[in-house]
Amino acid sequence: MPYSIPLLRPNPADPVPFYRLPHLIHTYSHLPTRAISHDDASMAYYSPAPIGCNLTEGFERRIEREDEEEHLDGLVESLEWLITRGRKGERKGGIITWRGMLTRLITMPYETRDPWEMTAIALDGSVYLELWDPPEEKAKRKREQSAWEKQGYMGYAYESFSTIPQEGRPGNGPEGWGGDVNTNVQWANVVRSAIGEIPLCIAGEVDCVKAEPGSPNPGLSGCMELKTNKVIQHPGHEAMFHKKLLKHWAQSWLLGIPEVVVGFRDDDGILRSQTTFDTAKIPYLVEVLNKPSWSPNRCLQSLHSVCSFLTKNVLPTDPLVTYPHIRGNRQAVKEAGELPPAVVWRLAFDPKKGCELHAVGEVGVVDGRWGGMLKEEYVRWRMGLE
């Protein structure tokens, strides 16, 4: 097994792979306790935030979720929930991951500052991909973010001012306030898609839907993303915003969300204006500039290149391929005394060097997680041992 494999950069002249329109297969909610409920309990309804609202509202009352590593738990639990009820889950031969991982892959050609690493393992015909986030990196990021804590909070406050929760607005806050921020609460969509010939199964948080409060889930066509940005005052601000639109487009395009609403605030956190963008048209807004800062074609080539790279190298190390007799064979596992180990891979990106994949080695069950990633009971179910 090769230790390290560099990823060749895609040729801009190569054909642009097609990104298949996402198909919604499941939704689930994180409740105020962070527990998962397989329904739309945390789905919120869009209601435009009042211009002039203060996005520092409720900062001292916010509830932040514990910094615990959840890996791919919500996504894989959803797949098990679907399949055990006779519904379709992922398509084999592809990648199962969070929307945030694919956002990093699709924007990679234009990332000039931040390196990252991801962990990949193969199981039951799919590559599971998540961020490799060691404790020292988490601590460093937390220190850096503490200086911008209030600015980061403004995005959550904008969501509160822009949405009506299932239980309605509290009634004791300022105009439009949807309730104090609790970052435990999230509503997520799980979709099937594909980049070229490679199947994708993606989950990601969705901010709200465009529908009458109290009405049922309208599906992907009614989903919306909410973002904040500083008021654009000069060409430098405008150039920065056009670069920011790359991430806004990628996040929404990958999950099939048709609209992005951006609230523009001043330095004091006062909302001055807001604009709705059609996700599919965002690339054209940038394309017409004299010097476009990014191209969706290069992004799609990048995504396909990395996904192809991963499936080609990681899928053959699936233990159900290398140890086919294990599937459904409880006796063999009992005699071995443990599950066959996962072959763990690390995908590393450095803006100056590019991307490479290297094999970390075989990892069994560590603290209840196979390969350090997937819960043991989920792996046993996938292997037909439950």
UniProtKB/Swiss-Prot annotation:
The protein's Enzyme Commission number: 3.6.1.-
Catalyzed chemical reaction(s): a 5'-end NAD(+)-phospho-ribonucleoside in mRNA + H2O = a 5'-end phospho-ribonucleoside in mRNA + NAD(+) + H(+); a 5'-end (N(7)-methyl 5'-triphosphoguanosine)-ribonucleoside-ribonucleotide in mRNA + H2O = a (N(7)-methyl 5'-triphosphoguanosine)-nucleoside + a 5'-end phospho-ribonucleoside in mRNA + H(+); a 5'-end triphospho-ribonucleoside in mRNA + H2O = a 5'-end phospho-ribonucleoside in mRNA + diphosphate + H(+)
CC cofactor: a divalent metal cation
Binding site for substrate: R34, E205, K227, Q251
Coiled coil: none
Gene Ontology, cellular component aspect: cytosol; nucleus
Pfam families per UniProt: RAI1 (PF08652)
GO BP field: mRNA processing; NAD-cap decapping; nuclear-transcribed mRNA catabolic process
MF term (GO), any: nucleotide binding
Protein residues bound to a divalent metal cation: E159, D207, E225, L226
Cofactor note: Divalent metal cation.
Keywords: Hydrolase, Metal-binding, mRNA processing, Nuclease, Nucleotide-binding, Nucleus, RNA-binding
Subcellular location: Nucleus
InterPro entries per the UniProt record, alphabetical: RAI1 (IPR013961), RAI1-like_fam (IPR039039)
Family (UniProt): Belongs to the DXO/Dom3Z family.
Subunit structure: Interacts with RAT1; the interaction is direct, stabilizes RAT1 protein structure and stimulates its exoribonuclease activity. The interaction also stimulates RAI1 pyrophosphohydrolase activity, probably by recruiting it to mRNA substrates.
Functional note: Decapping enzyme for NAD-capped RNAs: specifically hydrolyzes the nicotinamide adenine dinucleotide (NAD) cap from a subset of RNAs by removing the entire NAD moiety from the 5'-end of an NAD-capped RNA. The NAD-cap is present at the 5'-end of some RNAs and snoRNAs. In contrast to the canonical 5'-end N7 methylguanosine (m7G) cap, the NAD cap promotes mRNA decay. Also acts as a non-canonical decapping enzyme that removes the entire cap structure of m7G capped or incompletely capped RNAs.
Protein name: Decapping nuclease RAI1
Upper taxonomic lineage: Eukaryota, Fungi, Dikarya, Basidiomycota, Agaricomycotina
